[in-house]
Amino acid sequence: MSTLKPTSSKNEEHAHWGGVFAMTLCVFVLIASEFMPVSLLTPLARDLGVTEGLAGQGIAISGALAVLTSLSLSRLAGNMDRKHLLLGMTILMALSGMLIAFAPNYLVYMTGRALIGIAIGGFWSMSAATAIRLVPQHQVSRALAIFNGGNALATVVAAPLGSYLGATIGWRGAFLCLVPVATLAFLWQRFSLPNMPGNTKTASRSTVFRLFRQRVVSLGLLACGLFFMGQFALFTYVRPFLETVTQVSPSGLSLILLTIGVAGFVGTLLVALVLNAAFYPTLIAIPLLMAVIAGALILTGHSVWIVALLLGFWGMLATAAPTGWWTWIARTLPEDAEAGGGLMVAVIQLAIALGSTAGGMVFDRSCWQSTFALSGMLLLGAVVLTLLLSRLHKSLAG
């Protein structure tokens, strides 16, 4: 069983850092493309002649296609060279931007959004497996942190950049601006990524769900799912909390959200060092500290400066956490990281949906304190499961 083996890397000598940074640029464009409609929804809907609600479904369809792709790609790709597969996903990303920019109607717009969903699911499901093949084992967490840095940076700039470009050159021009950056990412990956043949041992296996037969995988994915549920049960409703409870000004709101994003970017730069020193203690400490922050926000929600400080710390922890869980996939399933990555994408997407939905129901029917308390309880559940996971992993390895 791969879970009983020490972590191995397909590449023990050469580090292809050019490929890592090329993929990070690809991550940046992917995330910017995924969330660009958020800041352009009103003019987009008006131009296509649909309601804002229908236009917003473009985000939903990209998420749904990301899940379906992540669960099926490893099997469908077979022995295909993973370099060619990544390049194909980058082409889909560029094509998506062009389709949306020139969409004459709602159907073409949704087709473009579906393509970006396929690219997102395909890329993230392969990220851990690709990191294993690009750098030596002791640098895998650093490579994954760099990938996630592109994610964090895009999260910070996508909405304000989209809003600015939309006001300057129109929403179509904003989407079109992503195409040359995607083309640059394609060319950079083309010349910096090594050939990465498909794994003939895993390509012929049954679906990714077979991994649930391994206790350590089931427990780990459950812990990961609870973490993301807890995170988004709270974070989805940060804006109404800041506006109605903390009562920040519009400029103050923007500043706090920017602080969260910048702190998250810093977190991704630091987390690799911490993970290498203390892997499971870090995975346990992150949700524990976030649960403490959720409780502290309940007690100090009316103090602007304390809330800003707490949410900045929250952003640093929450954005660093995915690097930890992707590193867990790379360490736990070094020979099956693609299938494990596919399951991870699906679990995270489902957890985000469940967490935000549950948080919203509590927010509407009870009060914001109950929503934050729910988040804290889910995060504490993740702490308990991660602690059990570390003990199980230790017993299996021993």
Place the predicted regions along the sequence by residue.
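Conserved MFS/SLC helix-loop-helix module at the cytosolic interface between two early adjacent transmembrane helices
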Residues: L68-P104
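Paired small-residue
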Residues: S96, L107-L115, W305-F313
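Helix-loop-helix hairpin linking two adjacent transmembrane segments in secondary transporters
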Residues: V108, Q137-H138, A145-F191
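A late C-terminal transmembrane helix in Major Facilitator Superfamily
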Residues: T332-W368, L374-S375
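Helix-to-loop junctions at the C-terminal end of transmembrane segments
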Residues: T69-D81, G267-F279, F363
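Helix-breaking motifs and short loop linkers at transmembrane-helix boundaries and internal kinks
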Residues: G49, D81, F102-V108, Q247, ...
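C-terminal transmembrane helical hairpin of 12-TM major facilitator-type secondary transporters
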Residues: P281-G324
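Cytoplasmic helix-loop-helix junction between adjacent transmembrane helices
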Residues: G112-G150
